[in-house]
Amino acid sequence: MFEIIFIGVGGGAPNKRGLPGILIRREGFEILLDCGEGTQNKMIEHSISFMKLNLIGISHLHGDHVLGLPGIIQTMAMYSRQQKLLLMGPTTLQDYLKSSSKHTYFKPGFETEFIQSYEDQNLTITTFRTCHTIESYGFLIKEKDKTKVDAERLKKEGITDWRIIRKLKEGKRVEIDTKVFLPEDYLYVKKGLSIAYTGDTAPCDSVLNAIKGVDLLIHDSTFLNEREAHDYGHSNCTDAAEIASKADVKRLALYHISGRYQTTEPLLKEAKKIFERTFLPEPLSYFILQEE
């Protein structure tokens, strides 16, 4: 299960929807995707701890996605953070943070590590290229598949001995009173949940190929239906819906909405004509992604 807080959902100049920042939690591991100006202020105002963050991923170095990052790192240090902070993003991200630290005369008192991908016993986090006007990446967060025992079948057949169940889970065959129990008859694979976040992007094959079949796609939907959207390296809400449909994703969240729109209803309405399982999160809205 993933818990997702859409801290800011707008894009471009600061606006009432806030700038990009998405908090994703899974069993004590916390990820922040993008960190626009004002992200830490929103977190403080609504009692969302940034001290618990394990990893921050930055899609690209346009200001609305990254200007909040130096500030949140400095505040972490002021609050005496000791835990290492993992960072993922474009090749220029490290230079940006070094320059920011140098010219604000500040050095974090904790370790930061720049990584290209992340893996632990439960999760993998990887990036994929998106099609924006500068170097830019999307993020793919996936739970690992788990091998499970069919408890109902074992119960029906009267198998309750934990030693037998353990052997089956280990992939070993078990023989009891001449009856043979094969692991493949009692094991199944539980597919892990997955989230894809595009950051800013025009529609392109590299995005489509990376996000196929994800449970939740958070896609650039800057505009309603502007001819210039692709020239700016952005997508219309209808582009996002078409990609969601082609990629056979489970749910679509429209994201990075331009401040020019006073209401988001037309964007959601147009997208849902193409892909029904679409929603448009409000700033600071909370979403739980779990098995259906």
Swiss-Prot record:
Assigned keywords, A-Z: Endonuclease, Hydrolase, Metal-binding, Nuclease, tRNA processing, Zinc
Cited function: Zinc phosphodiesterase, which displays some tRNA 3'-processing endonuclease activity. Probably involved in tRNA maturation, by removing a 3'-trailer from precursor tRNA.
Binding site for Zn(2+) 1: H60, H62, H132, D200
Gene: rnz
Organism of origin: Sulfolobus acidocaldarius (strain ATCC 33909 / DSM 639 / JCM 8929 / NBRC 15157 / NCIMB 11770)
Protein name: Ribonuclease Z
Domain of life: Archaea
Listed cofactors: Zn(2+)
Keyword Zinc found: yes
Similarity-based family: Belongs to the RNase Z family.
